[in-house]
């Protein structure tokens, strides 16, 4: 595990180097030091090991949710349903072709990729505002971006993948920044819970691809 001497920026750079190892890039990339071999790095993956990578991200989300529950009493609460609706977080539905009944690999891959791109806006908010384990928060954000890269390698019609409008990103960030502390904690909890659900359904879909 990283020690306190490692800043979130250093952690992010280390994780990006792991990403470079998993997916070679056009230019030369420096190697990692032996000290960076920790549980905070994702497994070295290729696109055919997407299942293990999704499990890795789910493990980080679980750790963050446990911390939110222990520190801020942000556990399951049905009263937060209204706030969740206001966030308009991505969900997988029957029409997305990801369920066993009516499964369609291309439609499903496209929807999962689009959904994770939509989550990036919310994960950026967590990365900036999470007051607990910054390493895990950074890991979820960066690893989800890497998962999108992995999925894009499998999508045949990449032009069907919808990228969020930059103006939506800007306006949502402005709204989220204006929240008080209680609502910030609630928002982070809801984003993590929704991403966990989304990835659980995605994991089941990947297993039957």
UniProtKB/Swiss-Prot annotation:
InterPro entries: 4_helix_cytokine-like_core, IL-6-like, IL-6/GCSF/MGF, IL6/GCSF/MGF_CS. The keyword Secreted applies. Residues 28-47 are annotated as: Disordered. It is found in: Secreted. The modification Phosphoserine is found at residue 78. Disulfide bonds join 69-75, 98-108. Keywords: Acute phase, Cytokine, Disulfide bond, Growth factor, Phosphoprotein, Secreted, Signal. This is Interleukin-6. The gene is IL6.
